């Protein structure tokens, strides 16, 4: 008997699972210092954490969740990004801690967009918060700031009282590090856990790093440049890496099943 992938819920679910697995593989390959993984309980709910190494948010460690629409990736609705704690940023709502993606994407297009684009955007707003609120330049050369954002108080503080903004952000960074080792609020085995350094536990890894075979295996002479992205230092570096990854995707794009393809069940 023949079933259409459009009319059979089981086939649609399997197809969605392959899409999400492909998205996860891209996330693992394309990004550094920001991590995301589908939860064990539901592939539409992702756990994430970002380590910020530079800029005024340097030293911050922020956890977040990504909620995919039920019909992902066919649904044009945007993903929902919710941070675990309140964060002072113009694009993060102080009430529900959600990230505004509408300045970045108007709608989701599965043939153009990937979850790693959203993760890259998260990196960008922390690497260059001023750049994230600017829409261009006036005729006099002054930066034009957005009229409306999720957190207007943060926008006004960043634009008019930058020292106070930096002070608040640095206090926030310290608080985020103080809670980095907190016990997880869920027993989901895919929850990203950060543990303190333990010499006994990491001695084998350190020995591997010192061994000639390990150095040879991780030598820059033997590996592709994209494997050595390092941490994000500026929005310029984000743009350069974005261009590199888009070129990589063009060379090896994920094959997508035909939407109307029939599946033969025996």
Curated annotation (Swiss-Prot):
SMART domains: UBCc (SM00212). Residues 15-178 form the UBC core domain. Belongs to the ubiquitin-conjugating enzyme family. FTS subfamily. SUPFAM superfamilies: UBC-like. This is Protein crossbronx-like. InterPro entries: UBQ-conjugat_E2_core (IPR000608), UBQ-conjugating_enzyme/RWD (IPR016135). It comes from Drosophila erecta (Fruit fly). CDD domains: UEV_AKTIP.
């Amino acid at each position: 008997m023949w079933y259409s992938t459009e009319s059979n819920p089981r086939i649609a679910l399997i197809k969605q699972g392959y899409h999400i697995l492909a998205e996860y593989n891209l996330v693992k390959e394309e990004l550094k210092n920001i991590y995301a993984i589908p939860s064990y309980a539901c592939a539409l709910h992702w756990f994430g954490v970002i380590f910020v190494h530079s800029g005024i948010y340097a030293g911050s460690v922020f956890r977040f969740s990504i909620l995919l629409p039920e019909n992902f990736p066919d649904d044009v609705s945007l993903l929902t990004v919710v941070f675990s704690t309140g964060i002072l940023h113009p694009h993060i709502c102080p009430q529900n801690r959600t990230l505004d993606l509408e300045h970045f994407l108007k709608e989701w297009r599965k043939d153009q967009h990937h979850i790693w684009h959203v993760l890259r955007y998260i990196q960008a707003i922390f690497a260059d918060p001023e750049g994230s609120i600017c829409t261009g330049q006036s005729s006099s050369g002054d930066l034009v700031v957005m009229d409306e954002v999720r957190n207007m108080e943060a926008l006004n503080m960043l634009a008019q009282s930058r020292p106070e903004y930096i002070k608040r952000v640095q206090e926030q960074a310290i608080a985020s590090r103080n809670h980095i080792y907190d016990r997880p609020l869920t027993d989901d085995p895919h929850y990203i856990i950060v543990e303190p350094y333990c010499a006994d536990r990491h001695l084998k890894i350190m020995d591997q790093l010192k061994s000639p075979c390990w150095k040879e295996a991780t030598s820059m002479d033997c590996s592709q440049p994209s494997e050595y992205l390092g941490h994000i230092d500026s929005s310029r570096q984000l743009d350069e890496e974005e261009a590199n990854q888009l070129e990589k995707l063009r060379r090896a794009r994920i094959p997508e099943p035909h939407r109307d393809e029939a599946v033969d069940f025996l």
